[in-house]
């Protein structure tokens, strides 16, 4: 059986990267929430 997680740097960046988060209003909300919480890493 093939496992669910098949790592790929490209796909990782394209779906969870900083620039993608900045594109949408909700993505920016995610970043702001993480900033408010004091996360060391805002995005992948």
Curated annotation (Swiss-Prot):
Example of a GO cellular component annotation carried by this entry: ribonucleoprotein complex
InterPro entries, A to Z: Ribosomal_bL34 (IPR000271), Ribosomal_bL34_CS (IPR020939)
GO molecular function, one term: structural constituent of ribosome
Gene3D superfamilies documented for this protein: 1.10.287.3980
Pfam families xref list: Ribosomal_L34
Gene Ontology biological-process entries: translation
Assigned keywords, A-Z: Ribonucleoprotein, Ribosomal protein
Keyword NADP included in the entry's annotation: no
Entry keyword annotation includes Nucleotidyltransferase: no
Family to which this protein belongs: Belongs to the bacterial ribosomal protein bL34 family.
Family matches, as PANTHER family: LARGE RIBOSOMAL SUBUNIT PROTEIN BL34M (PTHR14503:SF4), MITOCHONDRIAL RIBOSOMAL PROTEIN 34 FAMILY MEMBER (PTHR14503)
Protein name: Large ribosomal subunit protein bL34
Organism placement in taxonomy: Bacteria, Pseudomonadati, Pseudomonadota, Betaproteobacteria, Burkholderiales
């Amino acid at each position: 059986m093939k496992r669910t997680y098949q790592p790929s740097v490209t796909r990782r960046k394209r779906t969870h990267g900083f620039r993608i988060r900045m594109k949408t209003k909700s993505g920016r909300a995610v970043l702001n929430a993480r900033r408010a919480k004091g996360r060391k890493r805002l995005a992948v």
